[in-house]
Every structure is written in structure tokens, then in C-alpha cells.
UniProtKB/Swiss-Prot annotation:
Record-given protein name: Uracil phosphoribosyltransferase
Transmembrane segments: none
Annotated binding of uracil, by residue: 204, 209-211
UniProt KW keywords: Allosteric enzyme, Glycosyltransferase, GTP-binding, Magnesium, Nucleotide-binding, Transferase
Gene name tied to this protein: upp
Binding-site positions, GTP: 38-42
Activity regulation remarks: Allosterically activated by GTP.
Pathway involvement of the protein, from the record: Pyrimidine metabolism; UMP biosynthesis via salvage pathway; UMP from uracil: step 1/1
Length: 232
């Protein structure tokens, strides 16, 4: 894990060959949906493990079948709330849950519009109650412009007081990190790699494409609400 000296509280895993190999698979245009999802799960699980190294631990006394000894327990692992940004972050959350089994989970549906305005629409928020002892982990594979996460953080800060807020992603653009850190300097960011830049359409380059489409398939637009009302 490397601390990026351009910002305070920003870390990448560019020094970890296993994660870099997984990222290489995700970048590859020939990687299919199933393999892409599995790759996101692997990244979430390993990055969750690395994140536990930054949590507080305390020593305890225990008794083995042979004698008394000392051990350690995490003071934070049972006080974690993972917030998933629909839909691309689901596999990332699945990996995190494998490491942070006691975590509570919240879901936020947020989408970013097209260039040049990149308007953000949030139409579903379901987040469990957060305490001052909790660490909030926001899972979002791609930190591009940062606008989606800034909106999410703004909503969370209105009503929730936590011990710590962490953004965990796969790729980030420097522009997105700049925006987030200017708005919320205390938020920590952990990503597999920080890429070069955003292109004119707001995509990270070299990037890996649309993480949601590559994990679950390209969607088509359909309106189900009128039909659902008719079922009653």
C-alpha cells in the first residue's frame, strides 16, 4: 500500500503484484462479464483485508488448551457500514463482506449524466443507522469526476456522524480525487491504482470502460412502472 504524496489520506496498491494482475484482467477488452465480476470480488476482498491494517486493535488475554497468552482483537471490524453505489459496486461489496463479515450494508442509487454538465441523479437511499464508533466504507469502482461521491458524502454528512469515512475503489482520476478532497478533506481514499486523467467525456483513461456494463452486461431502457401498477 502506497500513500500518494499529492494528497493527504489517499492510498493505492500499485506495489501489490496480485492486485495489479487482477487489474490487468479487468482492463482487458476481451475479459467477459463473469471474469470481470470475479475480478472485482477479488479486489474487494483483498483491499478490505488491507484496510483492516489501518484499523485500531487492542491486546487481550486468552487461554489456549496449554496455557495463558496474549492475543489481539480489532476494535473497529464490528463497527463497519459498507455503502454500495448501484450497480457496479455490488461485486466490490461482495468481496468486502468476505473480509468484514459483521458489516452493515447500505445501498444508494446514483447516476451521473453525460458531458459537459455531468448532472447527478440520486433516486434511492437506504442506509442503516450510523454511530460515532462506525467506519463508513463507500464502495464505488470508478472515481472519475468525483461528482457522484460528493453528492453521496453531502447526504451522509447531513445526518450521520461516524468515526471515519473511507472511499474504496478500483481506479481513480486525479481530477476526481482533487474534487473530493477539496470538498471533504477528512475523507480517506483507497484505490487499486490512480490513472492518468479524464477524457472529454468524463471517463478515466486508460481506465477499464463502464464497470457496471462490463460486470453485468449493457442495459437497455425499459419502463416497468405502468405495468406494475396494473398488477394490483
Amino acid at each position: 500500500m502506497i500513500r500518494d504524496e499529492r494528497w493527504f489520506g489517499v492510498y493505492s496498491f500499485e506495489d501489490t503484484p496480485f492486485l495489479m494482475e487482477t487489474l490487468t484482467d479487468l482492463r482487458n477488452i476481451n475479459t467477459d462479464n463473469i471474469s470481470f465480476r470475479k475480478g472485482l470480488v477479488r479486489l474487494g476482498r483483498y483491499m478490505g483485508y488491507e484496510l483492516t491494517k489501518t484499523m485500531e486493535f487492542e491486546k487481550i488475554n486468552i487461554t489456549t488448551p496449554l496455557e495463558k497468552t496474549e492475543g489481539i482483537i480489532s476494535k473497529d471490524r464490528k463497527n463497519v457500514v459498507i455503502i454500495t453505489i448501484l450497480r457496479a459496486a455490488f461485486p466490490l461489496m461482495e468481496g468486502l463482506i468476505k473480509t468484514l463479515e459483521s458489516a452493515k450494508v447500505g445501498i444508494i442509487s446514483a447516476s451521473r449524466g453525460h458531458a459537459p454538465k455531468f448532472n447527478i441523479e440520486m433516486n434511492y437511499v437506504k442506509v442503516p443507522r450510523v454511530t460515532e464508533n462506525d467506519t463508513i466504507i463507500i464502495a464505488d469502482p470508478m472515481i472519475a469526476t468525483g461528482s457522484t461521491l460528493i453528492n453521496v458524502l453531502t447526504e451522509l454528512k447531513k445526518s450521520e456522524k461516524s468515526k471515519r469515512i473511507v472511499i474504496l475503489g478500483v481506479l481513480a482520476a486525479p481530477e476526481g480525487i482533487d474534487s473530493i478532497k477539496k470538498a471533504f478533506p477528512d475523507v480517506e481514499i483507497f484505490v487499486t491504482k490512480i490513472d492518468r486523467e479524464l477524457n472529454k467525456d468524463g471517463y478515466i483513461v486508460p481506465g477499464l470502460g463502464d464497470a457496471g456494463d462490463r460486470a453485468f452486461g449493457e442495459p437497455f431502457k425499459v419502463s416497468l412502472l405502468p405495468q406494475m401498477h396494473n398488477l394490483e
